[in-house]
Amino acid sequence: MKDIYNQILKLQLQIKYHNYMYHTLDSPIISDILYDELYNKLLQLEKLYFKKKSLDKKIKLLDQVGAKKLHIFTEFFHKIPMLSLRSINNISDFDLFDKKIKEYFKHINVITYFCDFKFDGLAVNLFYKNGILISASTRGNGSVGENITKNILMISSIPKKIAGSNIPKKIEIRGEIFMRKSDFFILNQSCKLSGKKEFSNPRNAAAGSVRQLNPEIVKKRKLNFFVYGFGLFDYNKKIDSHYQRLLQIKKWGFPLYKNYCVCKNKKEVIHFYHYANKIRSQLDFEIDGIVIKLDSIKLQNNLGCIEKYPKWAIALKFFSLDKETKIFKISFKVGRTGIITPVAYFFPINLFGVSISKASLYNIKTIKLLDIRLHDYVTVYRAGDVIPKIRNVLIHKRNKYTQKIIIPTYCPSCCTKLIFSDDLKTCYCPASFSCFSQNVKRLIYFSSKNGLNFKGLGKKNIIKLINYGYLYTPIDFFSLTVKKLKNIFRMGDKLSEKIIKNIAFSKRVSLDKFICSLGIFGVGTSIAKRLAYYYRSVEKFFNTNYDTLSKIDHIGYNISNAIISFLKNKSNRSIILKLIRILNIFI
């Protein structure tokens, strides 16, 4: 039972992290399919655990999974929870969904579904009182979102005042903010010309735009909105149909996309799915599937919800389209914690209007599993219509010119001997701050929110300080002066003084933040908290050993090995000792 519990904890942390990356930072690092696999695995493990162990359901870990809001925006509490949809990727899973619905409502002869496109944008909740837009917010964790009203007011397709008669006293309108492909292309061309970072896809561009602090930027980005549902519906006329409610919402001036379908049977739903899949490449906006809902509001309420999903609705996703290309280079990148990540470079292909020329292979095991070789022909797809991924190698096209990939044993940046994990799945460089590739990223991480949080000193400024020779190790942050900042950034006295004061203020830091700021392989915020709770002092952590680490929950061999290797490194020890003298570290 302990093994199952530990697996649940591990999956919970993974899903929380991916929720944060997707919903809060708008920067997903795994595909929707892989996310769904993790979530479904968590569901299965919880069922098994709580079946065998009689515990209060309130402590179920899955209920804690959600995306926290950024602290840039204020909180908004949804009147009715803004739930996510469970995703499926094949028609046989829809058959199962349909079967369960019909079994539950045996007394009803015809079950009617409402189907529409699953827009790939940012879900928003619009709250109107007496016909006036009072607030707009993101989904957040389903109960609490970010108040983005000022930015939403800049989107012309969102009514600021409800038109028509019989306007409800209170209503929550739910829909998707998106960017058209044509506008996305123009935006990226503009970013390219001005030397700014390009957006990876229209969804990230839309979500990133809505979270801008300057509403004028939102206005320039030409964002659009389609309504797909509602939360609170305080209306004097009783309307039991989801479809009829949407038609009423359309009469009030909200944009409802023309392609939807009221389906009387399973066959009509599947026909609509194939139709949507066929035309999606012709649309000027991204869709990644269709949404299937029970049309009757009464039946929806009877079914209710499970965990964070409604039982009466489901998202049927499209299969990703593959394209063939040829690999011409494999490089090994050094990450912040020293992790070595193989990246495949191939001749550019175009998938849904996006040019793709490389894909991460994630780890060494992927190379072995796929048997990827240099000059191989491969099929590439966008996982979840977002992340480029190699599906398979076209072995029949392999010729005598292909070359086996040689896995490095020494760091490509600093030539330090690499350390391999037990399962040989991953390897990392233990040189830490002595490795240039790591050092730049480590210094950025040290100053970030997960570290000491030096406000006002961003990534670009840190890179400049490194290039000018002012930053080599974390200690150098504390020897920065107003004069140095003014020389490099041409800042005024006030801003320079503010940054120096912020750095001085950050000298008082909790032990878990300090441990996390070091950027040890495998030690993120949650593990850092466990270590801080166990050791209670920086000196005890600094002098730890394998035996002590093995007693701490969730600290396995690989993490223990990484911690010991990091703390044994002479350069690291010197840096940590100096930091201990400079900082005021508390529990």
Curated annotation (Swiss-Prot):
Q: Cross-referenced InterPro entries, in alphabetical order?
A: DisA/LigA_HHH, DNA_ligase, DNA_ligase_AS, DNA_ligase_CS, DNAligase_adenylation, DNAligase_N, NA-bd_OB-fold, NAD_DNA_ligase_OB
Reactions it catalyzes: NAD(+) + (deoxyribonucleotide)n-3'-hydroxyl + 5'-phospho-(deoxyribonucleotide)m = (deoxyribonucleotide)n+m + AMP + beta-nicotinamide D-nucleotide
CDD domains according to UniProt: LIGANc
GO MF terms, alphabetically ordered? DNA ligase (NAD+) activity; metal ion binding
- Reported cofactor(s): Mg(2+); Mn(2+)
So where does Zn(2+) get bound? Answer: C411, C414, C429, C435
Which GO terms fall under biological process for this protein? DNA repair; DNA replication
**Alphabetized SMART domains for the sequence:** LIGANc (SM00532)
Q: Which UniProt keywords apply?
A: DNA damage, DNA repair, DNA replication, Ligase, Magnesium, Manganese, Metal-binding, NAD, Zinc
Q: What is this protein called?
A: DNA ligase
